[in-house]
């Protein structure tokens, strides 16, 4: 059973009011944080989210190509092609993109976390990271199924090689670990090479 009625609190976005020389100016909280070069990747990774994040990355590069960008991730993962659009843009632009996991970074969320600038990838203390192989579902003729199966296997190998490069792990180890859901704590994520440190308090890294 479904309903068109939505919880109004689910769409409530806090507003921030600032005093300027021309009077008060209000921003939604995400626009205000964007001024501080903070971007959020929260929820399912899909095309609409990816387009918004890519646009913000490109805007911040044009605003200042020499200043770091901070991508905060709390995501269960999602569509691989949408995630790759974000990943490729992170690598394409001039500013370093520092990634921070808050809550969880699973599947494509973990891939984006590890894809941040080396030395600038972090977890919060109680966050969780999960890596696994890409999931595929297809219905159709047998010949089409074979085509899609080959595509998924090729994608799996490519993602594993990129993850191995970003973590410093052997490809064979990454392939074994991603064969099933592989969960890591913040500390284990450091050992694996997914992140470079744990942010416990502002200005304090371990």
Swiss-Prot record:
UniProt entry tagged with the keyword Protease: yes
GO molecular function: ATP-dependent peptidase activity; ATPase binding; serine-type endopeptidase activity
Keyword entries, A-Z: Cytoplasm, Hydrolase, Protease, Serine protease
Top enzyme category: hydrolase
UniProt-listed Enzyme Commission number(s): 3.4.21.92
InterPro entries assigned to the protein according to its UniProt record, in alphabetical order: ClpP, ClpP/crotonase-like_dom_sf, ClpP/TepA, ClpP_His_AS, ClpP_Ser_AS
Family annotation (Pfam families): CLP_protease (PF00574)
GO biological process, one term: protein quality control for misfolded or incompletely synthesized proteins
Active site (record annotation): 107, 132
Catalyses which reaction(s): Hydrolysis of proteins to small peptides in the presence of ATP and magnesium. alpha-casein is the usual test substrate. In the absence of ATP, only oligopeptides shorter than five residues are hydrolyzed (such as succinyl-Leu-Tyr-|-NHMec, and Leu-Tyr-Leu-|-Tyr-Trp, in which cleavage of the -Tyr-|-Leu- and -Tyr-|-Trp bonds also occurs)
Cellular component GO terms, alphabetical: cytoplasm; endopeptidase Clp complex
Compartments, record wording: Cytoplasm
Top-level taxon: Bacteria
Function field: Cleaves peptides in various proteins in a process that requires ATP hydrolysis. Has a chymotrypsin-like activity. Plays a major role in the degradation of misfolded proteins.
Family assignment from sequence similarity: Belongs to the peptidase S14 family.
Subunit structure: Fourteen ClpP subunits assemble into 2 heptameric rings which stack back to back to give a disk-like structure with a central cavity, resembling the structure of eukaryotic proteasomes.
PANTHER family linked: ATP-DEPENDENT CLP PROTEASE PROTEOLYTIC SUBUNIT
Protein name listed in UniProt: ATP-dependent Clp protease proteolytic subunit
The organism of origin for this protein: Idiomarina loihiensis (strain ATCC BAA-735 / DSM 15497 / L2-TR)
Lineage, uppermost ranks: Bacteria, Pseudomonadati, Pseudomonadota, Gammaproteobacteria, Alteromonadales
């Amino acid at each position: 059973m479904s309903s068109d009625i939505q919880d109004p609190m689910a769409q409530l976005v806090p507003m921030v009011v600032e005093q300027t020389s021309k009077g008060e100016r209000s921003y939604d909280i995400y626009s205000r944080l964007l001024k501080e070069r903070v971007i959020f990747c929260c929820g399912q990774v899909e095309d609409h989210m990816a387009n918004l994040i890519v646009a913000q990355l490109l805007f911040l590069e044009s605003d200042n190509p020499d200043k770091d960008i901070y991508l905060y991730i709390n995501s269960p993962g999602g569509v691989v092609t949408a995630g790759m659009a974000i990943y490729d843009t992170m690598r394409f632009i001039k500013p370093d993109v520092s990634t921070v996991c808050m809550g969880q970074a699973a599947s494509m969320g973990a891939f984006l976390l590890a894809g941040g600038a080396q030395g600038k990838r972090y977890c919060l203390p109680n966050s969780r990271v999960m890596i696994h192989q890409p999931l595929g579902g297809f219905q159709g003729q047998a010949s089409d199924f074979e085509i899609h199966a080959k595509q998924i296997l090729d994608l799996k190998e490519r993602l594993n090689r990129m993850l191995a490069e970003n973590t410093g792990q052997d490809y064979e180890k990454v392939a074994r670990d991603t064969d099933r859901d592989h969960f890591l704590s913040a500390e284990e994520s450091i050992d694996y090479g997914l992140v470079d440190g744990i942010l416990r308090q502002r200005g304090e890294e371990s």
